[in-house]
Amino acid sequence: MQAGTVFATPFPRFIIIQMKKLLAVISIVLFAIQLQAQDIVLLNQIKTTNGKIKSFEADLENTLTKPKKTTTQNGTLYFVKPYEFAALFTTGRFMIVNENRIKMDIGLFHGTFKLKDGGMMQSLGNIFLYGFQGRIQDLANDNGYSLKTKTENGFHVITATIIKKRLIGIGYKTVVFKYHTDNFLLSEIVLYDYSGNQDSYVISNVKYDVPINKKTFQF
């Protein structure tokens, strides 16, 4: 052996395996961070775009899909920023939110209710009010939802799943918001309850920033 010769000691196999696992974990974490950053950009763009809208009037189609029955009704949706909206259907059914109260004759809900902090009715009202304004991250923070986003079929699709323990098992477990990819404006809100029912609200022919009679929201 010549003086000064150094022989490399090979890494044990288990160390190599652990290093590969570590690199895989790092790659997953970096990918997740990148996705989270993309989600934040998307949610901010949706909020910025819809937050500029002061009011709108739109055609509304509501489809309630139950395991053995599907019903559809049409009507008109009115919204005035930030806390007033009315869904008025040709069937005579309705849902009206006027700041801290909601009056409903739709589905399983009939009557006038106060929108109490943290209550199920407030959560329901916020789904629509926040959705109209693109405030999906605010909805998640204020009402206890986790969020997932994807883009498909010309829509940015945001799925909000309830994680607030006090509300799990009542109301809606999942809400899906669909915004157009070309302009970030709202197209549809779909609610899923714990009984397997799906309640879809699709808006079309939207007229933005139009004057709306305040009597529309009075009750």
What residues fall within each predicted segment?
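An acidic-aromatic
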Residues: 76-127, 199
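Sec-dependent N-terminal signal peptides
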Residues: 22-33
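One face of beta-strands
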Residues: 56-62, 73-77, 85-87
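Flexible, processing/modification-adjacent segments and terminal tails
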Residues: 39-45, 51-59, 64, 70, ...
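Short hydrophobic/aromatic-rich beta-strand segments that constitute the beta-sheet cores
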Residues: 60, 85-89, 102-106, 160, ...
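Short, Lys/Arg-enriched N-terminal segments with co-localized hydrophobic residues
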Residues: 6-18
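Gly/Pro-enriched, hydrophobic low-complexity segments
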Residues: 145-219
